[in-house]
């Protein structure tokens, strides 16, 4: 096992296990040799305040990654840089061979290949569970409603919630809502 490389944010090397300080966590027995996310020396500032410092990680296809650390350590910022929601000032991030920071990159298309679930995942309370899974597929990816619902139901089935599809988020437990968020990310 590699020794953890932890910067002042508590995050740096995705090929390490979690330690008491927090960090990026993956299983060193990678599911695939294919690297789908490659982050190299990524740094980000908000004005004079440096939020990310030389973050480097390689995530292989099939890996599950958890980003953890203390409040304000840059976890959300790091994740948002991976899918282009936050610009970064130094380094490079490649997702499926596409540079996130390149001006010509089609960010909506790139984002469709990166699934994330945040601790506070915010389901749309006015939409049914199945509609929570299909809205982005229809509006962002341009899928037809019947195709989006079919995919959404398949993912709800994977997380054991297909029977909950017509319900609203408030009708589900917190754990069930989290599983809906996971299905949506998938």
Where are these regions (language model features)?
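ABC family nucleotide-binding domain
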Residues: 20-23, 32-186
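Pre-NBD coupling/linker segments of ABC/ABC-like ATPases
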Residues: 2-33
């Amino acid at each position: 096992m590699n020794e953890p490389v932890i910067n002042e944010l508590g995050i740096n090397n995705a090929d390490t296990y979690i330690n008491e300080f927090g960090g990026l966590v993956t299983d060193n027995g990678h599911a695939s040799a294919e690297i789908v996310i490659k982050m190299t020396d990524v740094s980000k500032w908000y004005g004079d305040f440096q939020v990310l410092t030389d973050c480097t990680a390689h995530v292989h296809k099939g890996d599950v990654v958890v980003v953890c650390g203390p409040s304000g350590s840059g976890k959300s910022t790091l994740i948002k840089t991976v899918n282009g929601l936050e610009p970064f000032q130094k380094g490079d991030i490649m997702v499926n061979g596409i540079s996130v920071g390149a001006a010509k990159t089609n960010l909506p298309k790139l984002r469709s290949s990166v699934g994330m679930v945040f601790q506070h995942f915010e389901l749309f309370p006015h939409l049914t569970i199945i509609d929570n899974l299909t809205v982005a597929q229809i509006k962002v990816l341009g899928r037809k409603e019947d195709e989006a619902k079919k995919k959404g139901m398949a993912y709800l089935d994977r997380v054991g919630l297909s029977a909950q599809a017509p319900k609203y988020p408030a009708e589900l437990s917190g754990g069930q809502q989290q599983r809906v968020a996971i299905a949506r990310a998938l």
